[in-house]
């Protein structure tokens, strides 16, 4: 079975000891289903991650700045920097394409207070957990400090009014509940 991978035999449940990359499994599966052997599918998977990192970062930066040149440069650094190329032996650090979008959605949520951006942020963070546990924890810390910095800089106390609205509270609670349910399969392999 998947959780009892043979590389630490006879130890059980070894896949749960590290990043399992479930979130990127569909990408790999497309190449395997298309007839690629496992090494070729792995190479195509890796190239796809580089492309997705660039594309998603470009979308997030361009949505923020509306400047194609700056967005392209930022996305290039995010996807192809020397740090990334130096990590080719550690492929678990590459499925981070959702992170720039999550940061963008979180900013939109803080600045516009639309519940849909909280939903997108939550689902994106959960997806990052499925793509890579360690990257997701780092993204969680970034979101935490991003939120703290936002409130420290803007000193926006009108946010408290959002929590007086019962309908908003129900939406927040529902999204948090959904997030917990979606994370449960990773917690109980």
Regions found by a protein language model. Name each.
Residues 22, 36, 115-119, 158-161:
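Juxtamembrane loop-helix boundary motifs flanking transmembrane segments in multi-pass membrane proteins
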